[in-house]
Swiss-Prot record:
This is tRNA uridine 5-carboxymethylaminomethyl modification enzyme MnmG. Homodimer. Heterotetramer of two MnmE and two MnmG subunits. Its cofactor is FAD. Transmembrane segments: none annotated. It is found in: Cytoplasm. NAD-binding protein involved in the addition of a carboxymethylaminomethyl (cmnm) group at the wobble position (U34) of certain tRNAs, forming tRNA-cmnm(5)s(2)U34. Belongs to the MnmG family. Its main location: cytoplasm. It comes from Stutzerimonas stutzeri (strain A1501) (Pseudomonas stutzeri). The keyword NAD applies.
Amino acid sequence: MDFPSRFDVIVIGGGHAGTEAALAAARMGVKTLLLTHNVETLGQMSCNPAIGGIGKSHLVKEIDALGGAMAVATDKGGIQFRVLNSRKGPAVRATRAQADRVLYKAAIRELLENQPNLWIFQQAADDLIVEQNEVRGVVTQMGLRFLATSVVLTTGTFLGGLIHIGLQNYSGGRAGDPPSIALAKRLRELPLRVGRLKTGTPPRIDGRSVDFSQMTEQPGDTPLPVMSFLGSREQHPPQVSCWITHTNARTHEIIAANLDRSPMYSGVIEGVGPRYCPSIEDKIHRFADKDSHQVFLEPEGLTTHELYPNGISTSLPFDVQLQIVQSIRGMENAHIVRPGYAIEYDYFDPRDLKYSLETKVIGGLFFAGQINGTTGYEEAGAQGLLAGANAALRAQGKDSWCPRRDEAYLGVLVDDLITLGTQEPYRMFTSRAEYRLILREDNADLRLTEKGRELGLVDDARWAAFCAKREGIEREEQRLKNSWVRPGTPQGDAIAERFGSPLAREYNLLNLLARPEIDYQSLIELTGPGEPDPQVAEQVEIKTKYAGYIERQQDEIEKLRASENVALPADLDYATISGLSKEIQHKLGQARPQTLGQASRIPGVTPAAVSLLMIHLKKRSAGQQLEQSA
């Protein structure tokens, strides 16, 4: 039968992509249905209990700037917050939070259930209604037909999901959940390129069986970072520490002796796994020269003893998993609560998508998340928001939208997927963005919130907070520009004494702030009250200090564009080029591109790598000229 109500947008799947997609469409005012096989797993963190990290936090902040849920839920569920790369420049700093699974999921559920224009229905989707190459709706497991203008598929690892523990395997979307077999079969009938990918998860450990005195404590940062632009430290639950230990020679011996029982190394698994989150057996095999690998014990929550041992993802048989765990310092008596496993699943070549994440061959059908070959909650959430927004725009009869590479990491993510595709699970890094001095996590709202408001994604409260911040930045910049310090005055002498060099001439405070040895806090301590809002103060300081670098980067980008047709020698040995990662050396060696332009379009070859190639070619050319002149 047909469901009595028609919807504008239907979202299939209630993970990180699906929840952001459904919330985005509903915020834009269209009637939205979220179909999930289990209401209790909405927003579930299927793998590690953490949000953010290098490159990933930039996506979280962009989701937040566009009114999304991930950062808000993280502030409500985060039990440890840290800033990674804190000693480096703001462009590569990244906020990372350990999250309480229960609190995070509850925060997402609350947002979903209180979102106007959004309906939730528990039922697995088995089929799509497609007529004349246009999607018309969805058929559920019990034959119920839901009709809609746009459908967003966010199926995660559920399409044809196959779970592996040792040489045994069984169908599953994740541990404890059934796979989507009928829907996977239906999608394979469509004229879309399909492949198999793999991911994995480690065994979970009972913290009561762990000797933490044998490990290194890793507390969170003080003062506590905040994830959302609207967040506050008062929202955070009690904070906890993580713990660090290491694998050892005995661990590696156990793994090496049992590789023949690994589904990965015995040929049972066909799918390609994530390069930057390898299993422990893959680490031992690929990095045989390393004596040990770090293991981070991450708490799963405040009301459970379960720990997530980040660094030992495995699909080896359970008896081997137990040996591995108990060979590690501090875990000699550890009890495994849940075994680790690998999961294979279908994904579709993202080159068959438009920039809106709508499929090229079926109008109104959008894909987001792991179905597009990505890995990670943050990558999924960002795609979900974009797909949900474009599904709503289509239902409204409006043009689609996607940020450019110079506007957002989301733009980098989509451009990489759409133009290059991926043969392995795609993870975001800051190195993938050639405009990363502009695309900082601290200015995501300044880059995107105005567009979000225009699209209908940003509510009144967020818009008011954003406008106040933007006006505060302009006001403080103007104040600093109009405030002057002269040599020989009390202020001038105080600045000279603090920084060890007298003022040579009259400066305004904005000019002084641009100097590397002067920070905003020190400046206002010497010159009088400044901006009380820390976000405004941070933005004024970063904008002022980065101004020259940003201009220089724009020039570099223009030069890179001009170097499109620079030839690469056929005999170039990429392994000898300093600074290139092993991944990029391998890919360039396999593809043997003829020009820098071709090299730049190889999946995984970053703009930074192209710059290194250009520098190497210049050095090589200069060396050859010297030889000839000699």
